Every structure is written in structure tokens, then in C-alpha cells.
Amino acid sequence: MELLSTIRIFSSPNMKDLLIQLSQGKVIIYPTESVFGLGCDPDNKNAISTLLKIKNRSWKKGLILVAANYTQLLKYIDDSCLNETQRSRVFSTWPGPMTWVFPAQANRSYWLTGQFSSVAVRVSHFEPIQRLCLAFGKPLVSTSANLSGQLPARTIEEVHDQLGYKIPIMHEDILGRPNPSKIRDVMTGKLIRE
């Protein structure tokens, strides 16, 4: 019942259906700041496995989590080793299109971190992502909606061309940023992806 009252607050043409799909361990497609994203429940190993198969992506690469707020990420990251300068650097870019690679919690799931002991996370300012993560109550796995090695999809037509018609899509437009989020290491500030 609580889920249904939450859905009414966050209006989107098919929000209720998307939340049901996520809670059942399914993969969805949703708009991000620059491209369409494939997403699923970060706590559901089968959902992540399905996402990796759809994308034809190796589990070793790890995945990004996108959240509505910092609190949603605390289950997945270990921020205890950050000093004030590092914290300030992160919070000066969030919410926004900056992904930070944090040390992962000790009980991390290898299907999120891949071969690494870290996890990439982002707090988005983009309203559709905010609504989706708040309504779902946790972050989403976030990777571009395309086959590995192909260009990321910027339109629903491009999504259908690469991934077909079986995955439910959040019917809203991308924000239109020209590039995916930058990725930086939280400990060093080093740029990993421009």
C-alpha cells in the first residue's frame, strides 16, 4: 500500500509499471542526462545478470549506481576513509552529472563492483531519475542502453534499434547533455573518464 501512495506522488505515464518491473527483478530503460540508460535493482543478482546479458557486457567491468540522494548510496560505499577535502569535492558536484568511484562496502557484491574493490556512484539532479529512485526507494544500476561497443542510444528509436521492444521504457526525454557523466576517483580526484 505504501508503494502505491508513493507512485501517486511521482507522476509519469508508466511509473507504476516500471516500479513493478524493478521489484520483480526486471530490467528497465530510462532517460538520463545524456543518453538512455539500462537499469535494475542493485540488490538483485539475477536482475544484474540479465542486464549484463542484454548489453553483452563483462561482469568484470563493474557498474555505476545512480541515486536520488547520498543516503541511498551509503549501503554500497565506504566513505569512512574520506577527509573533509574529499567530501567537499564530491558534494560540490552533487547532485549533478559527476560519477565518483568510492571504496565499496566490505560486504560488496562482485556483480556491482566487478573485479574491483570500488563502486562508481552518482547522485543525479535529473528529475526523471530523482522520481524513479525516490519511488523505488534505492539507487538503480545505471549503464547506457546499448550493446557493448555500439553508440549509446539518445532516442527511443535508437533504443529499439539496438535492444528491441521487450524492455519497458520510461517515456520521457533525455536531458540532452552532449556527453555521459565524467568519472573521478574519490580518493585522488583523478579523472577516469572525460
From Swiss-Prot:
It is found in: Cytoplasm. One of its GO terms (cellular component) is cytoplasm. This is Threonylcarbamoyl-AMP synthase. Required for the formation of a threonylcarbamoyl group on adenosine at position 37 (t(6)A37) in tRNAs that read codons beginning with adenine. Catalyzes the conversion of L-threonine, HCO(3)(-)/CO(2) and ATP to give threonylcarbamoyl-AMP (TC-AMP) as the acyladenylate intermediate, with the release of diphosphate. Its EC number is 2.7.7.87. It holds the Pfam family Sua5_yciO_yrdC. Coiled coil: none annotated. Belongs to the SUA5 family. TsaC subfamily. PROSITE patterns: YRDC. It comes from the Bacteria. The keyword ATP-binding applies. Keywords: ATP-binding, Cytoplasm, Nucleotide-binding, Nucleotidyltransferase, Transferase, tRNA processing. It catalyses: L-threonine + hydrogencarbonate + ATP = L-threonylcarbamoyladenylate + diphosphate + H2O. GO terms for biological process: regulation of translational fidelity; tRNA threonylcarbamoyladenosine modification. Its main location: cytoplasm. Residues 12-194 form the YrdC-like domain. GO terms for molecular function: ATP binding; double-stranded RNA binding; L-threonylcarbamoyladenylate synthase; tRNA binding. InterPro entries: DHBP_synth_RibB-like_a/b_dom, Sua5-like_dom, TC-AMP_synthase, TC-AMP_synthase_SUA5.
